[in-house]
């Protein structure tokens, strides 16, 4: 426990409208923890194809080396296109509110509907807009991540990340899917 970290996490949580939050050592660590606490070898995730390059590499390469597959879809994919990307072993959907550096905007509501229709959580990286400009939980996200190094820090002097849980996803309702 670190009271300073706890205070910052609580502030970010309140700004996002979440139920709980934690800080990480970086934004990449936040995305890593959010994904790897849900998916494991043999699992699959669906992700927006337009995301920060480091996160794309995490999902497309590092996760694949660890036995987790991914299907990428456009950030404005239709519900039908999203549904086609799911597999029986899909564990999560990932996207970025506003992609860095492409500035493509994620259709959070459609991604949330697809994720929830398939019984999996939607994870949204909200680094670019921060909760000052967009609160993904209000649009259906279950988990929100941040690189606090970017806009929250102001100019990259401090490295950090955050994970916010909306507190609404019913993990127990999915049976053995999320032990």
For each of these PLM feature ranges, what is it?
Residues 21-179:
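Conserved PLP-enzyme active-site core in the AAT-like
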Residues 1-16:
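Aromatic- and Gly/Pro-rich amphipathic surface segment
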């Amino acid at each position: 426990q670190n009271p300073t970290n706890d205070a910052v996490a609580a502030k970010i949580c309140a700004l996002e409208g979440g139920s709980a939050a934690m800080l990480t050592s970086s934004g990449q660590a936040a995305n890593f923890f959010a994904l790897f606490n849900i998916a494991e070898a043999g699992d699959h995730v669906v992700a927006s194809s337009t995301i920060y390059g480091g996160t794309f590499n995490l999902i497309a390469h590092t996760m694949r080396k660890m036995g987790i597959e991914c299907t990428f879809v456009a950030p404005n994919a239709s519900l039908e296109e999203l549904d086609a990307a799911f597999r029986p072993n899909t564990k999560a959907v990932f996207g970025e509110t506003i992609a860095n550096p492409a500035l493509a905007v994620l259709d959070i509501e459609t991604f949330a509907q697809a994720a929830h229709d398939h019984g999996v959580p939607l994870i949204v990286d909200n680094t670019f807009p921060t909760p000052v400009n967009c609160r993904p939980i209000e649009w259906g996200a279950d988990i929100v991540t941040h690189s606090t190094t970017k806009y929250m820090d102001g100019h990259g002097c401090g490295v950090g990340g955050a994970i916010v849980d909306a507190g609404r996803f019913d993990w127990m309702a999915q049976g053995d899917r999320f032990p």
